[in-house]
From Swiss-Prot:
Record gene name: PKH1
Domain remark from Swiss-Prot or TrEMBL: The PIF-pocket is a small lobe in the catalytic domain required by the enzyme for the binding to the hydrophobic motif of its substrates. It is an allosteric regulatory site that can accommodate small compounds acting as allosteric inhibitors.
PIF-pocket as annotated region, ranges: 156-201
Bias-annotated ranges (Low complexity): 511-521
Positions of modified residues (Phosphoserine): 294, 296
Binding residues for ATP: 135-137, 154, 204-206, 210, 253, 267
Residues at the catalytic site: 249 (proton acceptor)
GO CC, one annotated term: cytosol
Organism: Saccharomyces cerevisiae (strain ATCC 204508 / S288c) (Baker's yeast)
Source species taxonomy: Eukaryota, Fungi, Dikarya, Ascomycota, Saccharomycotina
Protein name: Serine/threonine-protein kinase PKH1
Keywords: ATP-binding, Kinase, Nucleotide-binding, Phosphoprotein, Serine/threonine-protein kinase, Transferase
Amino acid sequence: MGNRSLTEADHALLSKPLVPTSAEHTQTQEYPRPFVDGSNSQSGSELQASPQGQFGEKALTSTNRFIPLANDDPGMQHEMGLDPSMRRRREEWAERGAAKIVKDVVDPATGELTKHVVKMGIKDFKFGEQLGDGSYSSVVLATARDSGKKYAVKVLSKEYLIRQKKVKYVTVEKLALQKLNGTKGIFKLFFTFQDEASLYFLLEYAPHGDFLGLIKKYGSLNETCARYYASQIIDAVDSLHNIGIIHRDIKPENILLDKNMKVKLTDFGTAKILPEEPSNTADGKPYFDLYAKSKSFVGTAEYVSPELLNDNYTDSRCDIWAFGCILYQMLAGKPPFKAANEYLTFQKVMKIQYAFTAGFPQIVKDLVKKLLVRDPNDRLTIKQIKAHLFFHEVNFEDGSVWDDNPPEIQPYKINAEAMKPLQKVSESDTTVKMANLQLAGNGHADTPLQAPAATSQEHSVISMTAATAAFNKDYTSQPKLGSKSSTSVRSASNNTDREVIQKKVSKNRASVSSPSISTTSRGKDNRSRSSDAFWSRYLQNMDERVLLMKEVALSTRNLEDSPVGLENVALDYKNPLDIEPPTDSAGKFYKKMFLITNLGRALVFVKRRSLSMWEEQEFELQFELELNDVEKIRFISDQVLEIDGSRTIFIGCKERAVLMKLWKLIHNGMTAKPKVVSPKSDHKMFDKFILQKRQNTKKKNQAPPVPQSNRLINGLPDRCILKTPEEGALHTKRPTSLQTRSSSNYSKLLARSTQMRKNMTRTDEK
């Protein structure tokens, strides 16, 4: 154990026994249970280390030394080879550190169950593979020698705990597991034991790993899986808070999956155990102040709450924030706040800077927005979360959350049902009434809201997948010609107050008409599908409709600003029947149309007819335009598309080079004037792009050349060497990957490769 030995105070702190309830003595349990004996039971305590990316210092030594010696036959031979005094010392510690448990034994004579007190320690288990490790603990698989049951044993070094002053974390986790023993959704602690050097926690074994591995395996989870696991997580968190424990480090790595694919919360080393307050109720139930502030800086960067970073305090509502982050990650496949390092991640958390991925379900988006709020007073309570429309089919009262079988794990795919706006639910059901209160954005029942909440009907309008919320409101009424209006919209993407001023100047054109968009169910939609007949080949399915259309000017001479702006695009929305067919002649370029559909897709169509070698041939370029500059543009509603960075154009192909060329083409043609204004500049760019695209396609269809040999010439592969037949000399072609390197670095690389070639030549001669 090193130069320092454990004192009596250290042993007293690390060796508090687990005290079972009176009900545990009368129950029949096939697993061993703790025994009430404080005099001789030396119970260890667990330490959950900080995984990668978590706050706190890393281990100074390797955690492999925490793993106990596998006590199989080779291990026994190793024990036999020890010095007799050392072997006797180990046996004494195995006897002293063993846990006294009550075990049900069947009397062979009478056939009755009798309770026997037995000792179980390190010699009663066979240790196997390592399941995981942390900064000062390791988790190994252990098998009971008598029953063959598998357990997860957490091993902690006593010396390291005392030297790094981590004993308090072990004590906290031990007390938390004591209070939570038998709670659904919480890892079960059976008993603890120790030897001279280590503490051991005998825990429930989770064969399916952690929740993060499940998300990484499938990339994301569909709505059914997300609802199933989210309901279990929030119910387990509710049980924690009812017992007076705040986890403070909920994340996918600390959520494990048992043999039945049910969630189990673990890692209570940083938990906060609240003191019990005097009860003011008639039933005498314990009361805990869940809003008591704590200044301990604990948690994980991607899931830490903003009040801990901004105000240096946290309470039980940090668990609700972490739940919102996990719910987002289930559907998106990544945390909402993720950056290159922890500092940048903290900056995103403090600014509530996150964006929803394309096609994110509307109902889940509504819930996440009300959880990831800067002010904890504005976040939903657990009761309001359970009453949300997303959990409308989940019954948290009858325990079916834990009894239902898990669904088939499938990744999330964008579908029309998920993109539908939230419907106003019936007022008759009590549970649905709670959902309406939650949908209206009410905060905690105990704390007043700082801003008025929108009604359910207004929320339904805001959720429409059209250009903006203000634009949706104007869809329901015809605009007056010659009038000017300004509409203010409050953004719901985070808790900061953003106002987007949308100015619409109507033109005196008879063809300008507002399509009638109904905010009710699709069955009451009065629109005729014939209006989408022309664009039917571009729509994904029967549920997709064209909501907005704009004819974009083609000549950069006529563009003062980007046509993506509100003033230029959102102005002239048209009915598809009012648009002349894009195939009508309009010069070399036919037309460029900008569309928005109810599934949140923004499409740009370019039609032209080449007059050269591909005469009478029509080229169609289809882009999916995702506009994210929420602070300035907000053209696409926050219910549709939000992506970090500047405007990005996606094409329906897998060629990255084509994508970049298209971006340059559209960006230069729409947002800036060319240095030399020429009506042919756009045409030349387009012709050059089409020509290069056809050439790239031909090259792609050709079979790649087979290299003559695997030898390196000048340290470079054969494909980098060109041989001129006339000269018969070898010319080194500089690889494309080295184009960005400086000439000095390339010279050094070439010199080194030349030396390698000489060495290879000498080897061949020998």
